[in-house]
């Protein structure tokens, strides 16, 4: 969400970043017909949502999470997929092509929106050419591919997308390098609250000492 927001901001769009990222949707006061909302919608919010509909919706992955809330994986997936099931004709649903649970759910549900499956294993020239080390990890590369595909549908200027990619710093506490010496790099990834969100940075590093904490979900 943060990356897409910054891409749109660099395109001089009237854009608001809201939702689970920390800014309540209802706190936004000045909006017009051209205002674009980039919303991070959690399964908690979607669970009781009946009418929320987004023209462009994305599910990057699905893995067991928030089971203490939803009780079963099936109910968790049902809440997440409301994001796509509430869409109508002319809307766009962006999903990870090589995700087993997403593929299974797509077969079980007929969606009204146009489904765009993103192959996260495919190389992208913009990523290959960037000197921004933030996008070297698997997770951040996937985030970029989703933001890039949405940007293409929105017909955003490629040059400005490239500008944003080169200078993007990411989120605080998300794969944030807080110390680096010759043989030691300390990474703060405390914003990752599940194994599926941590696996990208683990795959991108070697000789790891992984410190975990928090409440089991």
Predicted feature locations:
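A conditional alpha-helix N-cap/helix-loop micro-motif detector
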Residues: 18, 73-77, 191, 217
């Amino acid at each position: 969400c943060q990356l897409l927001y910054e891409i749109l901001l660099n395109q001089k769009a009237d854009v608001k970043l809201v939702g689970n990222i920390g800014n309540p949707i209802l706190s936004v006061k000045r909006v017009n017909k051209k205002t674009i909302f980039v919303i991070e919608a959690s399964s908690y919010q979607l669970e009781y949502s009946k009418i929320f509909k987004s023209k462009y919706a994305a599910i990057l992955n699905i893995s067991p999470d928030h089971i203490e809330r939803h009780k079963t994986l099936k109910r968790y997936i049902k809440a997440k997929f409301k994001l796509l099931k509430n869409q109508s004709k002319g809307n766009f649903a962006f999903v990870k092509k090589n995700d087993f649970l997403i593929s299974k759910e797509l077969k079980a549900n007929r969606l009204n929106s146009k489904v765009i499956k993103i192959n996260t294993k495919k190389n992208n020239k913009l990523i290959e050419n960037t000197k921004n080390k933030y996008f070297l990890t698997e997770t951040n590369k996937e985030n970029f591919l989703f933001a890039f595909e949405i940007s293409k549908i929105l017909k955003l200027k490629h040059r400005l997308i490239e500008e944003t990619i080169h200078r993007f710093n990411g989120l605080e506490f998300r794969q944030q390098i807080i110390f680096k010496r010759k043989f030691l790099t300390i990474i703060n990834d405390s914003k990752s609250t599940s194994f599926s969100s941590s696996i990208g940075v683990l795959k991108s590093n070697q000789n790891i000492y992984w410190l975990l904490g928090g409440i089991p979900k």
